[in-house]
From Swiss-Prot:
Functional note: Xenophagy-specific receptor required for autophagy-mediated intracellular bacteria degradation. Acts as an effector protein of galectin-sensed membrane damage that restricts the proliferation of infecting pathogens upon entry into the cytosol by targeting LGALS8-associated bacteria for autophagy. Initially orchestrates bacteria targeting to autophagosomes and subsequently ensures pathogen degradation by regulating pathogen-containing autophagosome maturation.
Gene3D superfamilies associated with the record: 2.60.40.2840, 6.20.250.40
Chief location category: cytoplasm
Listed name of the protein: Calcium-binding and coiled-coil domain-containing protein 2
Membrane topology listed for this record: Peripheral membrane protein
PANTHER family: CALCIUM-BINDING AND COILED-COIL DOMAIN-CONTAINING PROTEIN 2 (PTHR31915:SF4), SKICH DOMAIN-CONTAINING PROTEIN (PTHR31915)
Region (Interaction with MYO6): 395-446
Database matches in InterPro entries: CALCOCO1/2_Zn_UBZ1, SKICH, UBA_autophagy_assoc_protein
GO molecular function, one term: zinc ion binding
Intervals of motif CLIR: 133-136
Keyword Cell membrane: no
């Protein structure tokens, strides 16, 4: 499949949040035959604009998020969106990457934000000749899938309710945290104002005390009144100090609560990070299993090719063997004919074929003059090699009184051409080129 190593953009968007009607799939079959490429036809609606990272995936029926795709192909962007033909597009899925089971699947168009923009009707991957058998099973599976979809919708609604509850709880906590922060800022501002006021008032009191001391020296009669005034001011200062301590203690409590909320937030973030790591490990495991499956199928194909080559060579060897067997039978037939012809000629000459020496010469006797293609050899080799003809082996013709009847027969036999025929290509070789003939036949088996 012509897809890049980069994973497509996905999201955990729920089914109710998708816009399935913005891309329309057409010409979707009820089932596709395994082993063949599948072409997906789709059409963009008027207000939908495709983007570069959009993709079409094959999902098993009952999927929840776009991360559950089986395989995908990138979408080809049309050159002119205003053209009507540009709205109708297609993409082809290679047979090797398609599902191998008979579950129900559907095409889904996903944009680069991971949001589903269109979904097709369900279909299967199964052989065509099983259509009649699968009619009842398909209906049962459809009912089972509908029941499963109802359960998934119910579970989905529960998850959405939980999600809304968690979102509301999170929103309340954020609002409470914001409120606490505002209160803390207000308290800090009040604290600063009080500190400034206390400092100013303390300075004022010190100045007033100094003035009172100066006045004490001048007005001894008013000393008691000023002492009472000092006591009152000191009591007021003590009360304000206690109030300030309470405010400081409240500020510390709010700070501790804020730290506790920060710790809880960090704990939740760490938990989310661990879950993402586990999900990434699972995705890597799935990818490794796909690679192992690809390697095994390649190895199986290589073994099948090797088995085919061996079968082909075995068939060729059988053909050569049969051809050699036929050639052997033909040569044996020719030898039998030659033996009968020799017996006839010897009978005509008055000689007994069985009483002749050198009838079946060995490899050391007369080997140079024999035909390498014959099994029984030349029956006249002994007569040709003798230095003088025996009176018992040669008879004169009673009619013509000729002594050269044997020479005539030998001359006629030597004039007969002996050839070797290739049983495969029918090429003819002289009898003296037996080695070349054998090398030629052996080359056919390579």
């Amino acid at each position: 499949m012509e897809e890049t190593i980069e994973d497509p953009p996905t999201s955990a968007v729920l089914l109710d949040h998708c816009h399935f009607s913005q891309v329309i799939f057409s010409s979707v079959e009820k089932f596709y035959i395994p082993g063949g490429d599948v072409t997906c036809h789709y059409t963009f609606t008027q207000h939908f604009i495709p983007r570069r990272k959009d993709w079409i995936g094959i999902f098993r029926v009952g999927w929840k998020t776009t991360r559950e795709y089986y395989t995908f192909m990138w979408v080809t962007l049309p050159i002119d969106l205003n053209n009507k033909s540009a709205k109708q597009q297609e993409v082809q899925f290679k047979a090797y990457y398609l599902p191998k089971d008979d579950e129900y699947y559907q095409f889904c168009y996903v944009d680069q934000d991971g949001v589903v923009r269109g979904a097709s009707i369900p279909f299967q991957f199964r052989p065509e000749n099983e259509e009649d058998i699968l009619v009842v099973t398909t209906q049962g599976e459809v009912e089972e899938i509908e029941q499963h979809n109802k359960e998934l919708c119910k579970e989905n609604q529960e998850l959405k309710d939980n999600c809304v509850s968690l979102q509301k709880q999170n929103s309340d906590m954020q609002a409470e945290l914001q409120k606490k922060q505002e209160e803390l800022e207000t308290l800090q501002s009040i604290n600063k104002k009080l500190e400034l006021k206390v400092k100013e008032q303390k300075d004022y009191w010190e100045t007033e005390l100094l003035q009172l001391k100066e006045q004490n020296q001048k007005m001894s009669s008013e000393n008691e009144k000023m002492g009472i005034r000092v006591d009152q001011l000191q009591a007021q200062l003590s009360t304000q100090e206690k109030e300030m301590e309470k405010l400081v203690q409240g500020d510390q409590d709010k700070t501790e609560q804020l730290e506790q909320l920060k710790k809880e937030n960090d704990h939740l973030f760490l938990s989310l990070t661990e879950q993402r790591k586990d999900q990434k490990k699972l995705e890597q495991t799935v990818e490794q299993m796909k690679q192992n499956e690809t390697t095994a199928m390649k190895k199986q194909q290589e073994l099948m090719d090797e088995n085919f080559d061996l079968s082909k060579r075995l068939s060729e060897n059988k053909i050569i063997c049969n051809a050699l067997q036929r050639e052997k039978e033909r040569l044996e037939g020719e030898n039998d004919l030659l033996k009968r012809e020799n017996s006839r000629l010897l009978s005509y000459m008055g000689l007994d074929f069985n009483s002749l020496p050198y009838q079946v010469p060995t490899s050391d006797e007369g080997g140079a003059g024999q035909n390498p293609g014959l099994v029984y050899g030349n029956p006249y080799s002994g007569i040709q090699e003798s230095s003088s003809p025996s009176p018992l082996s040669i008879k004169k013709c009673p009619i013509c009184k000729a002594d050269d009847i044997c020479d005539h027969i030998l001359e006629q036999q030597q004039m007969q051409p002996l050839c070797l025929n290739c049983p495969i290509c029918d090429k003819i070789f002289p009898a003296t080129e037996k080695q070349i003939f054998e090398d030629h036949v052996f080359c056919h088996s390579l």
